[in-house]
Amino acid sequence: APVENQGSFPKMFPRGSHWAVGHLM
């Protein structure tokens, strides 16, 4: 679970679906 990334990505990908894209990048 990429919980560690939830600290930065939600700012740009708070939707979750887009967050997945940010996690890949």
UniProtKB/Swiss-Prot annotation:
Compartments, record wording: Secreted; Cytoplasmic vesicle, Secretory vesicle lumen
Pfam families (alphabetical): Bombesin
Keywords for this protein: Amidation, Cytoplasmic vesicle, Secreted
Cellular-component GO terms for this entry: extracellular space; secretory granule lumen
Sites of Methionine amide modification: M25
Tagged with keyword Metal-binding: no
Family to which this protein belongs: Belongs to the bombesin/neuromedin-B/ranatensin family.
Function: Stimulates the release of gastrin and other gastrointestinal hormones.
Descriptive protein name: Gastrin-releasing peptide
Species whose genome carries this gene: Scyliorhinus canicula
